[in-house]
Design a protein with these regions (language model features):
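Acidic-and-aromatic substrate-binding clefts and catalytic sites of carbohydrate-active enzymes
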Residues: 36-40, 64-72, 140-144, 171-172, ...
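N-terminal binding-site loop/beta-alpha segment at the start of enzyme catalytic domains
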Residues: 1-91, 157
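Short, acidic/polar
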Residues: 38-51, 110-126, 174-178
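N-terminal small/glycine-rich loop or linker at the start of catalytic domains
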Residues: 18-36, 94-107, 130, 135
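Hydrophobic faces of well-ordered beta-strands that scaffold small-molecule active sites
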Residues: 25-29, 59-61, 91-95, 134-136, ...
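Active-site groove signature of glycoside hydrolases
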Residues: 123-143
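Alpha-helix N-cap and loop-to-helix initiation/capping positions
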Residues: 39-43, 71, 75, 106-114, ...
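Beta/alpha (TIM)-barrel catalytic core signal, keyed to glycine-rich beta->alpha loops juxtaposed to Asp/Glu
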Residues: 2-9, 143-332
Length: 332
């Protein structure tokens, strides 16, 4: 029987999510990878236990995380029931809908029918009455934004989610969504977007600045650029690496001579800071107050332990920030 560490809140940093009452850990655990059908049940359980013992209270899922679709939620639901039932009120559990989930015209995008049905399925898979945060997972070019945001509002008012968020939105669409949700008095608190030293899209499309101005939180996914911002590829492609095992999101052709030179330069900087490259890349995400939390993925508990160490070293000098910017642009 699992008993959580009595020291779990001693070192983790908790940041306010925009101007809401919600606090999130600086480091959150994402279940996008390594919680699917073929994942080792004991390893999944060990990762969740390790995370919670280190103060990671936020566990992030989506309806189609796996593979197979839904399997991450199903596996997490089993872990919740077996280990975390006494701690449910200490946890922030989030899920999403917006990408392809089931066949036919009602299993994708942002219609009211899809979002409400999908969350009902997610709650059943996880054995929950509600989630803490429910996200629309991507912008829908065809469904009126009023319908999509209205569905999120209905979900909160039905008690199936406490807060709502949006994921993969750009700045202008986020502003429109926020205005609709504010009129509905629906608690929209957070944006989830890809963000890393190598991917500055939310800086370029205005979302990062605008979210801060509007009092909305940001949680960053893919902070390590699917593993590029680590030292694992500096000497070839390891047999157990994501490129070798699962080439869906990162391909070997990403490892160009120029990219490897950038990684090498960043790795040297990290060593000078007393960090691994992965740790520095995570710390960089949290360099200012615009970003509430950074989502990490893990394949084993030891990675979570290493990543959480960033809470002791999240400050950068202006010289360091300038150098990182230059390296990321290829100016070595």
């Amino acid at each position: 029987m699992y008993t959580a560490s009595s020291e779990r809140y001693d070192t983790m940093v908790y940041n306010r999510c925009g101007k809401s009452g919600l606090l999130l850990p600086a480091v959150s655990l994402g279940l996008w990878h390594n919680f699917g059908t073929n994942a080792d049940p004991e390893n999944m359980k060990a990762m969740c236990r390790t995370a919670f013992d280190l103060g990671i209270t936020h566990f992030d899922l989506a309806n189609n995380y796996g593979p197979e679709y839904g399997s991450a939620e199903t596996n997490f639901g089993k872990i919740l029931k077996e280990d975390f039932a006494p701690y449910r009120d200490e946890m922030i559990i989030s899920t999403k809908a917006g990408y392809d989930m089931w066949p036919g015209p009602y299993g994708n995008w942002g219609s009211r029918k899809y979002l409400i049905a999908s969350l009902d399925q997610s709650l059943k898979r996880m054995g929950l009455d509600y989630v803490d945060i429910f996200y629309h997972h991507r912008m829908d070019p065809n469904t009126p934004l009023e319908e999509t945001m209205g569905a999120l509002d209905s979900i909160v008012k039905s008690g199936k989610a406490l807060y709502v968020g949006i994921s993969n939105y750009d700045g202008p669409t986020m502003v429109r969504a926020a205005e609709i949700l504010e009129d509905l008095k629906c608690p929209f608190v957070i944006n989830q977007n890809r963000y890393s030293i190598f991917d500055r899209t939310i800086e370029q499309n205005g979302l990062k600045k605008t979210a801060n101005q509007m009092g909305k939180g940001i949680i960053a996914f893919s902070p390590l650029a699917q593993g590029l911002l680590t030292d694992k590829y500096l000497h070839g492609i390891p047999a157990d690496s994501r490129i070798a095992v699962d080439g869906r999101f990162l391909h070997a052709d990403a490892l160009t001579k120029e990219k490897l030179a950038q990684i090498e330069a960043l790795n040297k900087m990290a060593a000078e800071r007393g960090q691994s490259l992965a740790q520095m890349a995570l710390s960089w995400i949290l360099k200012d107050e615009d970003v509430t939390s950074v989502l990490i993925g893990a394949s084993r508990p030891e990675q979570i332990i290493q990543n959480v160490e960033i809470v002791h070293n999240m400050k950068f000098t202006q010289e360091e920030l300038t150098k990182i910017d230059q390296i990321s642009k290829g100016n070595l």
